[in-house]
UniProtKB/Swiss-Prot annotation:
<feature type="binding site">
    <location>
        <position position="959"/>
    </location>
    <ligand>
        <name>Zn(2+)</name>
    </ligand>
</feature>
<keyword id="KW-0479">Metal-binding</keyword>
<dbReference type="GO" id="GO:0002161">
    <property type="term" value="F:aminoacyl-tRNA deacylase activity"/>
</dbReference>
<feature type="binding site">
    <location>
        <position position="962"/>
    </location>
    <ligand>
        <name>Zn(2+)</name>
    </ligand>
</feature>
<keyword id="KW-0547">Nucleotide-binding</keyword>
<dbReference type="GO" id="GO:0005737">
    <property type="term" value="C:cytoplasm"/>
</dbReference>
<keyword id="KW-0648">Protein biosynthesis</keyword>
<feature type="binding site">
    <location>
        <position position="585"/>
    </location>
    <ligand>
        <name>L-isoleucyl-5'-AMP</name>
    </ligand>
</feature>
<dbReference type="InterPro" id="IPR001412">
    <property type="entry name" value="aa-tRNA-synth_I_CS"/>
</dbReference>
<dbReference type="InterPro" id="IPR050081">
    <property type="entry name" value="Ile-tRNA_ligase"/>
</dbReference>
<dbReference type="GO" id="GO:0004822">
    <property type="term" value="F:isoleucine-tRNA ligase activity"/>
</dbReference>
<dbReference type="Pfam" id="PF08264">
    <property type="entry name" value="Anticodon_1"/>
</dbReference>
<keyword id="KW-0862">Zinc</keyword>
<comment type="similarity">
    <text>Belongs to the class-I aminoacyl-tRNA synthetase family. IleS type 1 subfamily.</text>
</comment>
<feature type="short sequence motif" description="'KMSKS' region">
    <location>
        <begin position="626"/>
        <end position="630"/>
    </location>
</feature>
<keyword id="KW-0067">ATP-binding</keyword>
<dbReference type="InterPro" id="IPR013155">
    <property type="entry name" value="M/V/L/I-tRNA-synth_anticd-bd"/>
</dbReference>
Length: 974
């Protein structure tokens, strides 16, 4: 028994609760998502909705090609942002009738997995580990990680071809990758060379740009060093003589009198110094440092160097950099002389001395300058970062540990150290081991970007980039990038299928060998490279030469793996397209997957592998900080869904709230997430759910087939609601088409809360609850509610997929489609659109808001409770409001469109004399509003205050309108 019924019984009054049309629905007020969402996912699976629906559509193919996450570690908020964005887009395209097959992928090779395998073994097991055993264990580990991540993605409501994902360790994938490599070889884009590359001593392998990170706070020991001159070219002597400066001719005197000053942040590279480079266009000065010697420095840096070196520098002469070329200096630590040479535009006066220490084996600019001047590529550092015998007395020192202090001490003892100071700057670290990297010249395999750089830039122009800044970013990277080092000195990867001649190191890599290896890998997988010897790996034409060749041991950069996915997946699998319609990943992939995919596709086929690229930012905490265990600010997506250990502090919100978060953020920038944000999102989710529940609950006795009212016969309020729904649907469609999902979020929230709950449904309560069941005023509202709930379910389906399906399964009348996704994207009938309704209704909504403000003022003073306790007088001031009131009076349905009903007050007076007794009033440009207490008695059924309550003997406590309803109700329910 309800409180109202108990109170009525206690006072001897009849209860009319059972005569009202109350909510009836199985759609719960609470989502109970932990239980209900998996049930809905099982429903999709059992009915082939998630797997087959997209393939049954007959519209154009839509391919969102999945960038493969790494098969290692737990899922995090970055995964959630990425995968949910993709799923929202795919579900929208399915609803739009496009043919959609989403193939999820995983990146399965590489060092992290190899290290995980090694870390799980003791020393003895590692000693017994062969390459093929390591590969088998790595593959098993990767597959286990894939299984775990896949379950997580599925729990988020992600639809994909989970039965046939692509893994970069699959033999068909590896074969396609070999084919891409082979075609690049045959087109002349692949070569082997000795060049400085990013080298990780901690991983003992070369790294690509995309495998580097630049943490804050790195400090290097920088040194200013003087190299004594041994020989001065005649043109330089003559120029200095013309300025009144004559240099000694005797060598010992010259080396004391003239020295070239350099600056470096890598003292450990000084044993590899083979030149000092200058910019031929810069002015260089000879300055006296007060110790009986002259230093050569950039003229523009004299003042700053004087401060840095803490000594006055007296200017003696100035010459152009071009004249310094050919000066011979002596290495201050080794028995070696080297030249001053002309470098490039990388030599500036922004820092240092304007003269650059040049070690061709340890820097890209140094290497190119060395090549230009015929310098050897000296690299006295081994794979572990230890200086070799070529470093002379420094052999055995580690470049990242004791080499710098040892060399700095030697410089000081030699009198060559001008200054030492700590220098903070960006420095590359191995993204996996988090240890510093170095530049080290080694024999590596490269993809020569020069051969197709312009084609790649042209291809970038043909792609749509979202946001547009992405185009500038990748264009700058491709313009400036050097050749791509694609070889790695690791076991767990796809082999570079090359053979080397035993006697002379000649390389065997041609169409015949490539085709043979591709066929072997297609049949057996890349393990075949380690399982078989040269006799089987070489094609038949070379079988009798097998003893002359040895197979290579390098594997391919994992970015070449994932960068070949267009060849292994998009262009091979059924129901996919190449170029793909969309690539969608984090903004860091401009230098990663977007770029590696672009380069391989352009190199082989001359065009980009994608038509559009969309990038998102990173998930941060609510304070805008990166998530880290040390800060304790990591948000776990599975805790959002299932709840944490303390479910009061970390309640289970379900996957739809996680998905709603993704739709709420401007993903083009970094996006925050945390407990406070989740509470706000859960509140929005509840409002959408409660609005949906209210719509469903009022349709329990309604069947559109027999009970619907024609749109043309609907009251103004109902026709406006359809017009407003049409406007919102149009804007939501635009938001999905332009991938601006935050607009969808805002539109949905405003539609459910402002348009429906606070306005239309608030006004509709009287006719829904109080009317006789089949009264036209009720049926017209139910007609609108049915039309809206079906479309609401449809347009939230890409984001709130579980709620949308739950709504559909709780529709209380029969529909043709088993699932909301089978209905397709909601359509708007043309007769819903009536733009003439918008302006007058907006005026009336503004009036309603103004009246509510005055009523709230009365409530605040406890002079009124419910709005039905009020009587209101309105004197319209603005011409627009006056016109709207006339429009409503002339065109409105008296049973629905009375202004009194729209304002939810018991009495209303328009114009006339001011009231003598008012509780509150307000006047502005819109209207004068007066509020008084309603006259009459409260009807116990509809709660309106009416003058005829008590005039009906059989129903002494209700108004005449309700008496009439009860009579009709009795007749209708017979």
């Amino acid at each position: 028994m309800s409180k109202e019924t108990r109170d009525a019984a206690a006072e001897g009054r009849p209860s009319y609760k059972d005569t009202l049309n109350l909510l009836q629905t199985g759609f719960g007020m609470r989502a109970n998502a932990v239980k209900r969402e998996p049930e809905l996912q099982a429903f999709w699976s059992d009915n082939g909705i998630d797997g087959q629906l997209g393939l049954q559509n007959d519209g154009p193919t839509f391919t969102l090609h999945d960038g493969p996450p790494y098969a290692n570690g737990a899922l995090h908020m970055g995964h959630a942002l990425n995968k949910v964005l993709k799923d929202v887009i795919n579900k929208y395209q399915v609803l739009k009738g496009r043919r959609v097959r989403y193939v999820p992928g995983w990146d399965c090779h590489g060092l992290p997995i190899e290290l995980k395998v090694l870390q799980s073994m003791d020393q003895e097991q590692r000693k017994a580990l062969t390459p093929i055993k390591l590969r088998k264990k790595a593959a098993a580990y990767a597959r286990k990680q894939v299984d775990g991540q896949m379950k997580g993605f599925q729990r988020w409501g992600i639809w994909a071809d989970w039965e046939q994902p692509y893994l970069t360790l699959q033999k068909e994938y590896e074969a396609a990758q070999i084919k891409v490599f082979g075609e690049m070889v045959l087109k002349g884009h692949i070569y082997r060379g000795l060049k400085p590359v990013h080298w990780s001593p901690s991983s003992r392998t070369a790294l690509a740009e995309a495998e580097l990170e630049y943490p804050d706070g790195h400090t290097s020991p920088s040194v200013y060093v003087a190299f004594p001159a041994m020989e001065v070219p005649t043109p330089l002597r003559d120029a200095l003589k013309a300025e009144g400066l004559e240099l000694p001719t005797e060598t010992d005197a010259l080396r004391q009198a003239l020295q070239v000053a350099i600056w470096t942040t890598t003292p450990w590279t000084l044993p590899a110094n083979l030149a000092v480079s200058v910019n031929e266009r810069l002015d260089y000065a000879l300055v006296d440092d007060g110790s009986g010697r002259m230093l050569v420095v950039a003229a523009d840096l004299i003042e700053s160097l004087s401060t840095t070196l803490e000594r006055p520098l007296k200017h003696r002469a100035t010459v152009k950099g071009a004249l310094l070329a050919g000066l011979i200096y002596r290495h201050p630590l080794l028995d070696r002389t080297s030249p001053v040479v002309i470098g490039g535009e990388y030599i500036t006066t922004e820092s240092g001395t304007g003269l650059v220490h040049t070690a061709p084996g340890h820097g890209v600019d140094d290497f190119h300058t060395g090549q230009k001047h015929g310098l050897p590529v000296l690299c006295p550092v081994d794979e572990a970062g230890t200086l070799t015998a070529e470093a002379g007395p420094f052999a055995g020192l580690n470049v990242l540990k004791d080499a710098n202090p040892g060399i700095i001490e030697a410089l000081e003892q030699a009198g060559a150290l001008l200054k030492q100071e700590a220098y903070s700057h960006r420095y590359p670290y191995d993204w996996r081991t988090k240890k510093p990297t170095i530049f080290r010249a080694t024999e590596q395999w490269f993809a020569s970007v020069e051969g197709f750089r312009q084609d790649a830039l042209d291809a970038i122009d043909q792609v749509q980039w979202t946001p547009a800044s992405g185009r500038n970013r990748i264009e700058a990277m491709v313009k400036e990038r050097g050749d791509w080092c694609i070889s790695r000195q690791r076991t767990w990867g796809v082999p570079i299928p090359v053979f080397y001649h035993h006697s002379n190191g000649e390389v065997l890599l041609n169409a015949d060998t490539l085709s043979h290896i591709e066929t072997l890998i297609a049949s057996h997988g890349a393990d075949v490279w380690w399982e078989k010897d040269e006799t089987d790996l070489l094609p038949p034409a070379y079988a009798n030469q097998a003893d002359q060749w040895r197979k290579g041991t390098d594997t391919m950069d994992v970015w070449f793996d994932s960068g070949s996915s267009w060849a292994a997946v998009s262009s091979q699998r059924e129901s996919l397209s190449y170029p793909a319609d969309l690539y969608l990943e984090g903004s860091d992939q401009h230098r990663g997957w977007f770029q590696s995919s672009l380069l391989t596709s352009v190199a082989v086929n001359g065009h980009a592998p994608y038509k559009r690229v969309l990038t998102h930012g990173f998930a941060l905490d609510e304070k805008g900080r990166k998530m880290s265990k040390s800060l304790g600010n990591v948000v776990d997506p599975m805790v959002i869904i299932e709840g944490g250990k303390n479910q009061k502090q970390e309640p289970p919100y379900g996957a739809d709230v996680l998905r709603l978060w993704v739709s709420s953020v401007d993903y083009s920038a970094d996006v925050p997430i945390g407990a406070g944000i989740l509470r706000q999102l859960a509140d929005v989710y509840r409002k959408v759910r409660n609005t949906s529940r209210y719509l469903l609950g009022n349709l329990h006795d309604f069947n559109p087939a027999s009970d619907a009212i024609a749109v043309a016969d609907l009251p103004l309020l109902d026709r406006w609601m359809l017009q407003r729904t049409a406007e919102v649907m149009h804007e939501i469609t635009e938001a999905f088409e332009s991938y601006e999902f935050f607009r969808f979020f805002q539109l949905l929230q405003n539609f459910c809360v402002t348009d429906l709950s606070n306005f239309y449904l608030d006004i509709a309560k009287d006719r829904l609850y109080v009317s006789a069941p089949t009264d036209q005023r009720r049926r017209s509202c139910q007609t609108v509610m049915a039309l809206i709930i079906e479309r609401l379910a449809g347009f939230i389906a890409p984001v709130l997929c579980h709620m949308a399906e739950d709504i559909w399964q709780n529709l209380p009348y029969p529909v043709q489609e088993t699932s909301v996704f089978q209905r397709g994207w909601p359509t708007i009938p043309s007769d819903w659109r009536n733009d003439t309704l918008s302006a007058p209704v907006q005026q009336l909504r503004d009036l309603r808001a103004a009246v509510n403000k005055v009523l709230e003022d009365c409530r605040g003073r406890q002079e009124l409770g419910a709005s039905l306790e009020a009587a209101v007088r309105i004197d319209a001031r603005s011409p627009e409001l006056q016109a709207a009131l006339s429009w409503l009076n002339d065109n409105g349905d008296p049973d629905v469109d009375g202004l009194r009903d729209w304002l939810l007050v018991s009495q209303l007076q328009l114009g006339g004399e001011p009231w003598a007794e008012v509780l509150s009033n307000h006047e502005d440009e819109l209207a004068l509003i007066e509020v008084s207490r309603a006259r009459g008695t409260k009807c116990e059924r509809c709660w309106h205050y009416e003058g005829d309550v008590g005039q009906h003997p059989d129903h002494a406590h209700i108004c005449g309108r309700c008496v009439g309803v009860l009579e009709r109700r009795t007749h209708q329910l017979v």
